[in-house]
C-alpha cells in the first residue's frame, strides 16, 4: 500500500480526523475517563503546538494514523501519542510512523525517546499481582503479554522497559515506561 506523511495541522479536516482516530482508539478502554470528541480535539491541538513534533500517515488521501513527540527533558522526549485506525493494525504502519519520528528526532539532536503504555485492561502479567519494592524488577523482567498489549510492539522496535508506575490507573493497573536510545551508532 502506498502511503504519504502529512502534517496534522495541514487542514481542519485532518485535525478532526486525527481527533476521531484518537477517540476511537481510546474510547471505552478506561485509560482516559474524560475522553470525548472535544477532549480529543484539545489533545490534537496540544500535539500540534510549535514545540511538538506531530505528523500523520495517509493512504489514498485518508488519514490512517498519527504520532506525536513532546519535550520531556532537553535530549529525551516523550512519544505521545501513536495511534493507528484499527483496520490498519498489524500492517506495519505504526513502525513506519515510529521510524520516521526517530529520524526527525535525530535531526533535532534528541538522543532518547520514552513512551508510557498503560495496562488498564489487564493485558499483561503486571496486572495479576500487587507490585511492591521487593518484586517490581522480577515482575518487569518476567512480563507476559495476554491481550496484544502495545509494550510488545515497542520492544520489537528496539525499546526497553525501564520501569513501571504500579497502580497508576487504579489497583493493579500500571503504566509501563519504555525507552530507546536513538543516537546513530558510529562504526567501530
Question: Predicted regions span which residues?
Answer:
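Short glycine/proline-centered loop/turn elements that form peptide/ligand docking sites
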Residues: 147-150, 167-174
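Conserved GNAT acetyl-CoA-binding A-motif
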Residues: 105-146
Amino acid at each position: 500500500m502506498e502511503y504519504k506523511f502529512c502534517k496534522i495541522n495541514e487542514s481542519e479536516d485532518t485535525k478532526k480526523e486525527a481527533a476521531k482516530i484518537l477517540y476511537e482508539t481510546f474510547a471505552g478502554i478506561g485509560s482516559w475517563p474524560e475522553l470525548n470528541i472535544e477532549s480529543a480535539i484539545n489533545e490534537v491541538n496540544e500535539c500540534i503546538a510549535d514545540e511538538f513534533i506531530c505528523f500523520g500517515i495517509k493512504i489514498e488521501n485518508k488519514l490512517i494514523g498519527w504520532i506525536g513527540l513532546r519535550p520531556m527533558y532537553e535530549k529525551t522526549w516523550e512519544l505521545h501519542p501513536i495511534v493507528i485506525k484499527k483496520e490498519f493494525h498489524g500492517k506495519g504502519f505504526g513502525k513506519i510512523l515510529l521510524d520516521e519520528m526517530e529520524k526527525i528526532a535525530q535531526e533535532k539532536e534528541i538522543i532518547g525517546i520514552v513512551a508510557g503504555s498503560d495496562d488498564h485492561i489487564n493485558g499483561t502479567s503486571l496486572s495479576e499481582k500487587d507490585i511492591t519494592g521487593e518484586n517490581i524488577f522480577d515482575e518487569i523482567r518476567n512480563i507476559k503479554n495476554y491481550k496484544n498489549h502495545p509494550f510488545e510492539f515497542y520492544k520489537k522496535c528496539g525499546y526497553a522497559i525501564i520501569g513501571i508506575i504500579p497502580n497508576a490507573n487504579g489497583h493493579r493497573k500500571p503504566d509501563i515506561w519504555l525507552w530507546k536510545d536513538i543516537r546513530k551508532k558510529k562504526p567501530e
